[in-house]
C-alpha cells in the first residue's frame, strides 16, 4: 500500500526505547533503593508502598478479593508491582502495602475521557461489558494512605482499598451516561 495510507503491510515498527527489564528496575529496584535510602536517614520510618490491584491478580467472578489470597498476577504490570512489594517486605523498614484498583476523581484523565464520550452518547466497553471492576475515589485513597502511614495497626499488612461495591464495565458506562444526562449506546470493543 501507499506510505501513510494505513493499507498494506507495515514497513517498520515503532519502539519507545523502553525494555521490560527497565520497568522491573523501576518497580522492584526503585522501591528497594528508596527503602534503603530512607532506612539510612530515618530507620524508624514506615514505608507505605502504593502498589496495584494487578499485583493480586483477578478475583473469581462475583467474589471480590479479601486481601488474604496468595497473589496471582496475570499481566507483566502486575508481576512488576508484585516484585516491588516483595523487595519492600524483605527490606529494612516496617512496611504497609496498598493495592488500589482504578482511581477516579479530581485530575483523573482516563475516566474523564469516558465522561466526554458519554456526552456524545457513546460508551465503549471491552467485550460484552460484563467485566467486573472495582474503583476508589482519589480523596478516599488519600485518606487510606494517611491511615496506612499513621495507624500502629497497619504495619506488615497489605490492603485493598476500594469502594465496597463491585460493578461491571457496562454498568459503569450506563452510570456515566446517567451522570451526564444522556442515554448512551454501549459499544463493545474487542478485547485484545
Question: PLM features: residue spans?
Answer:
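Alpha-helical membrane-targeting segments
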Residues: 113-138, 183-192
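Mid/C-terminal beta-alpha module of Rossmann-like enzyme folds, strongest
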Residues: 148-192
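Substrate-positioning beta->alpha
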Residues: 109-113, 127-150, 156-160, 171
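NAD(P)H-binding glycine-rich loop region in Rossmannoid oxidoreductase-like domains
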Residues: 1-29, 55-58
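Conserved Rossmann-fold NAD(P)-dependent oxidoreductase catalytic core, especially the SDR/UDP-sugar
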Residues: 32-76, 96
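Glycine-rich NAD(P)-binding loop of the Rossmann-fold in SDR/ketoreductase-type enzymes
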Residues: 22-33, 79-80, 136
